[in-house]
Curated annotation (Swiss-Prot):
Disulfide bonds: none annotated. Keywords: Carbohydrate metabolism, Glycosidase, Hydrolase, Polysaccharide degradation, Secreted, Signal, Xylan degradation. The keyword Secreted applies. SUPFAM superfamilies: Concanavalin A-like lectins/glucanases (SSF49899). Endo-1,4-beta-xylanase involved in the hydrolysis of xylan, a major structural heterogeneous polysaccharide found in plant biomass representing the second most abundant polysaccharide in the biosphere, after cellulose. Hydrolyzes xylans from oat spelt and birchwood at similar rates, but it has no detectable activity toward Avicel or carboxymethyl cellulose. The lineage of its organism: Eukaryota, Fungi, Dikarya, Ascomycota, Pezizomycotina. The keyword Signal applies. This is Endo-1,4-beta-xylanase 1. Pathway: Glycan degradation; xylan degradation. GO terms for biological process: xylan catabolic process. GO terms for cellular component: extracellular region.
Amino acid sequence: MKFFATIAALVVAAVAAPVAEADAEASSPMLIERAGPGGINYVQNYNGNLGQFTYNENAGTYSMYWTNGVSGDFVVGLGWSTGAARSITYSSSYTASGGSYLSVYGWINSPQAEYYIVESYGSYNPCGAGQSGVTQLGTVVSDGATYTVCTDERVNEPSITGTSTFKQYWSVRQTKRTSGTVTTGNHFAYWAKYGFGNSYNFQVMAVEAFSGTGSASVTVS
């Protein structure tokens, strides 16, 4: 197992995320009929009930909180049904202990891949030294900071097309922040040297948690 264990699963738009000892069925995402700010038209709601997830798509805002009793992994957020090399501006109040990420999150259709641009996290760094199965790919400088880049391969794991083998691409900001603009194209261009494609599935500004305690209120534009 890599990144502790596997969690996953949607038919149209999946979540396959690293978690600690957890597997579960995902809640369905939702396309929004009336787009919010920045053309936001997508709600990511994977096990959002575990984090008391609430959102206002027209305002581009959402919030959640979780405790040590969190019984699995949840990934929630707002964004776009089709990803792009766009600049995503966000602001948040995000605090977390244990396993949690504040990140741009999405999927590529072909070659199939899952990706994270991690802006802040709890105590678990997915590109940290000594992580089993991780390939370090150096660093990329973007938006005034250096990000550590790594990749991992998932073998026969749940994905946006069912069970498959795919790569995870990670950029982890070395100096955490909870607001700013993420120029996703800088990361995509760097990852492309290592096989990252441009056939985009969904893309969201997300909060994920799978252990510890925390809370977040996020605005996306």
